[in-house]
Amino acid sequence: MSARIGFFVGKGGVGKSTLAAATAVQAALAGEKVLVVSTDQAHSLGDVLGAPIQPGRPGGESEPVRILAEEQGGELDAVELDTLALLESAWRLAAPVLAVRFPESDLNDVAPEELSAVPGIQEVLGLGAVADLAGSGRWDYVVVDCASTADALRMLTLPSSFAVYVERSWPRHRRLSTGLDDPRQAAMVALVESMHAQVARLAELLAGPDVGTHLVLTPERVVVAETVRALTALAVMGIRVNEVIVNQVLFQDDSFEYRNLPEHPAFDWYAARIGEQTAVLDHLAAATGDVKLILTPHLAGEPIGPKALAQLLDQARRRDGGTPPGPLRPIVDRESGSGLETIYRLRLQLPPLDSGELSLGRAGDDLIIGVGAVRRRVRLASVLRRCIVTGAALRGSELTVRFRPDPLVWPAGADGGAIGGDQ
């Protein structure tokens, strides 16, 4: 049985590693067997846990390090993945196949380090390693300390995009029927099949009910702006967000009177900072549709080690609100008319956004939704594939796209079609 997986995502410096480690400690103290994994090449997980962790690969020389063992059965292990080592291992398998298929190339002379500049390749290999760890049966919960926001989003969204584009550029039925009598071509097909199967497995894993992300931020305007974009991108790409954690919040002591304070730079700074944080949190609520927040305190000292990390979450407060926006779920129905005059509509609940950020397009059987720099292909229901788009409207956070039958491909005499099919 695969473990639950929680990905901690956030801008560098917001305390992402600290919150990931604290969550892992809390789960272990509750009796679960937990693994906390760092996929960030700038590893700091061992520093936060107060224990040396040797970066390594699952199954390689470095095994997860035991951090905590509780009498009630809870355990905490930690590992820092070396994604460059994963890349070297994968390239050793792929390079000979590619070199045979393309004999005039110099692929055998390419060092794995040269491929590390290819966007997303190390992130996806790291994600594959996380999936293997979660599926090993050794742990109940795997907590992942991701790299900074842009790298983490690439890791979480690339599998589904890659699977779609491989299938569109070289469909499986063509791959399996091309040059099977040519050993070089057969080896190439086998390599692509293996890659496609791996990324499809990862895409399916990320869409599963036991996987979610935890967005970590600090109450600062620049950080909030990036977090809102990340929240929107994850929803559009179909990745579930479990919670939004605001770190380093200055709490007011309810037993203390904050008015008429003596004139002193320390009091002035504290009062101004609390006011600024309150305004930023209000802005965050407005920009995200008032999602519920977990607020962790700004401590005088760094929380290092399991005991201090557990206390950090014990002191956290919660701000009520709605659940973070979930993955897109298209709803298709018939709005009016019959035959060639039928109007169908596709409705999608989007995260809060400015209409100027939204773009729409169509490519064959897919609706392409763009929000900022993120693009998502949504497979149209079978009835809509025989229709043309007549218009779209965004009201609040609900997007409605309307279709009518295309007379060139619509079955003669048909009165509408079945609602459904692949999304």
What is the predicted function of each stretch?
Residues M1-V9, V14, L19-A207, T213, ...:
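Flexible phosphate-sensing "switch/lid" loops adjacent to ATP/NTP-binding sites
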Residues G396-D406:
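Long, intrinsically disordered, low-complexity Ser/Thr/Pro-rich regulatory/activation regions
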